[in-house]
Swiss-Prot record:
The keyword Hydrolase does not apply. GO terms for biological process: bacterial-type flagellum-dependent cell motility. Residues 1-24 form the signal peptide. InterPro entries: Flag_FlgI. Assembles around the rod to form the L-ring and probably protects the motor/basal body from shearing forces during rotation. This is Flagellar P-ring protein. Belongs to the FlgI family. One of its GO terms (molecular function) is structural molecule activity. It comes from the Bacteria. It holds the Pfam family FlgI. PANTHER family: FLAGELLAR P-RING PERIPLASMIC PROTEIN FLGI, FLAGELLAR P-RING PROTEIN.
C-alpha cells in the first residue's frame, strides 16, 4: 500500500514537472485597489429552539442575555425561573464586502461561546453586527445550518463534523453602507497580492502602454501609483474596469514549501539545484517484548512467582542509494532522481532541507 501511495505522489510531482509556459493573468487577479476590501463584523446573540443541546445552568451569561431580551419585549420574569438548555449564547461574525448596499444580504457564521453541545436546528435571534468603529452595519437573524450531528448515551456517543458552529446563509441584511473610496479621487493605488519588483514593473508598463501616456508609476515592489487621465476624470469606475482587464505575466521567486505536519511538499517551477549527490537509506528498528513467568519449585516456602521481562531488538538498515543531481537541474530532474531512491514525501522534506543546508538549493525554503 505504501508503495502504491508513493508512486501516486511522485506521479503527481512528475505531472507538475512537465514543461510549462508562463501564462499572462489579469491585473484584477494579482492586485487590488487601495481601500477596496472587506470589513469584518461581529456581534453577540442567542440561538433558540435547540433540542436540549443548549448551554447548561452553569453558564450564567446566556440566562442574563435571555432575561434582557425578554425585558426589552415587555416581559418580566424571575431569573431563577429560567433554564437555558434550549438556548445557546453565540458569537456572530460576517464579512462586509466593498460597495455593499443597504438591503444586501450577507452570510454569517455562528459559533457557540458557552458549553452547548449542538446548534443544529436552532434559530439565531436578531443580532446587531458591528464594525471596528462600534457602528452597526448589519443585522442578522435566521435558521442555523450546521451539517452535523451529535448523539450519545451513557457509555458511547457519535458526532459528525462540528456541531457547535454553523452558518446562516443570507442571514444578515446590510443597514449601513461603507463610504465609496473611489469617488472623487484623482489618484489610485494598486496593491499587489505578492510584492515583486519585476511584476510591479511589468504592471506599470502594461498600463502605460494601454493609455499611451504615463499613468502608472512605481513607488515600491508592492504597489503601483495611478494618476487618472483627464479623459476618465469623474469616470473612475470606467477607468478601473479598463485597467483590471489588462493582462500581465507575473514573476515569482523560486520557492520550496514544506509542511512537516502533513508531509506536503510544493516545489515552484523556477527552482534550480546545483550539482549535488544525495544518498538515502532507511533504518528499521524492531522491538518485541515477550514477558515470561518465573515460578518457584513445588512446595517451596521461600520462592514467589515473578514476571521476568524478555526483550528482543533487531535493527535492519537498507542499503543506501546514491543519486547525483547535475547543476541547473529543474523540478522534473529532482523528482525523477529522488523517485529512483524510493523516498516518501516525508523523506523528501528532510532531503530538501539537507540540500538547502549544503548550499545547492537555489531557492527559498519555507517550512510551514
Amino acid at each position: 500500500m505504501n508503495s502504491i501511495f508513493r508512486k501516486i505522489v511522485f506521479a503527481a510531482f512528475l505531472l507538475l514537472a512537465l514543461p510549462q509556459f508562463a501564462l499572462a493573468v489579469r491585473i484584477k487577479d494579482i492586485a487590488a485597489f487601495d481601500g477596496v476590501r472587506e470589513n469584518q463584523l461581529i456581534g453577540y446573540g442567542l440561538v433558540v429552539g435547540l433540542n436540549g443541546t443548549g448551554d447548561s445552568d452553569q453558564t450564567k451569561f446566556p440566562v442574563q442575555s435571555l432575561v434582557n431580551t425578554l425585558e426589552r419585549m415587555g416581559i418580566t420574569i424571575n431569573r431563577a425561573d429560567i433554564t437555558v438548555k434550549n438556548v445557546a449564547a453565540v458569537m456572530v461574525t460576517a464579512a462586509l464586502p466593498p460597495f455593499a448596499k443597504q438591503g444586501n444580504s450577507l452570510d454569517v457564521l455562528v459559533s457557540s461561546v458557552g458549553d452547548s453541545k449542538s446548534l443544529a436546528g436552532g434559530t439565531l435571534l436578531m443580532t446587531p453586527l458591528k464594525g471596528a468603529d462600534s457602528q452597526i452595519y448589519a443585522v442578522a437573524q435566521g435558521g442555523v445550518l450546521t451539517n452535523s450531528f451529535s448523539y450519545g448515551g451513557q457509555a458511547a456517543s457519535v458526532q459528525k463534523n462540528h456541531p457547535t458552529a454553523g452558518r446562516v446563509p443570507g442571514g444578515a441584511l446590510v443597514e449601513r453602507e461603507l463610504p465609496n473610496v473611489l469617488a472623487g479621487r484623482s489618484q489610485l493605488r494598486l496593491n499587489l497580492h505578492q510584492p515583486d519588483f519585476t511584476t510591479a514593473s511589468r504592471v506599470a508598463a502594461v498600463i502605460n502602454n494601454k493609455f499611451k501616456m504615463t499613468v502608472a508609476s512605481l513607488t515600491d515592489p508592492g504597489s503601483v501609483q495611478l494618476a487618472i487621465p483627464d479623459d476618465y476624470q469623474g469616470k473612475t469606475v470606467e477607468f478601473v474596469a479598463a485597467l483590471e482587464r489588462l493582462e500581465v505575466t507575473p514573476d515569482v521567486m523560486a520557492r520550496v514549501v514544506l509542511n512537516e505536519r502533513t508531509g506536503t511538499i510544493v516545489i515552484g517551477e523556477n527552482v534550480r539545484i546545483s550539482t549535488v549527490a544525495v544518498s538515502h537509506g532507511n533504518l528499521t528498528l524492531y522491538v518485541k517484548e515477550t514477558p515470561r513467568v518465573s515460578q518457584p519449585a513445588p512446595f517451596s516456602s521461600t520462592g514467589e512467582t515473578k514476571v521476568v521481562p524478555r526483550t528482543s531488538i533487531k535493527v535492519t538498515e537498507d542499503r543506501g542509494s546514491l543519486a547525483i543531481l547535475q547543476q541547473g537541474a529543474n523540478i522534473g530532474d529532482v523528482v525523477r532522481a529522488l523517485n529512483a531512491l524510493g523516498v516518501t514525501p516525508r523523506d523528501l522534506i528532510g532531503i530538501m532541507q539537507a540540500i538547502k543546508a549544503a548550499g545547492a538549493l537555489n531557492a527559498e525554503l519555507m517550512v510551514i
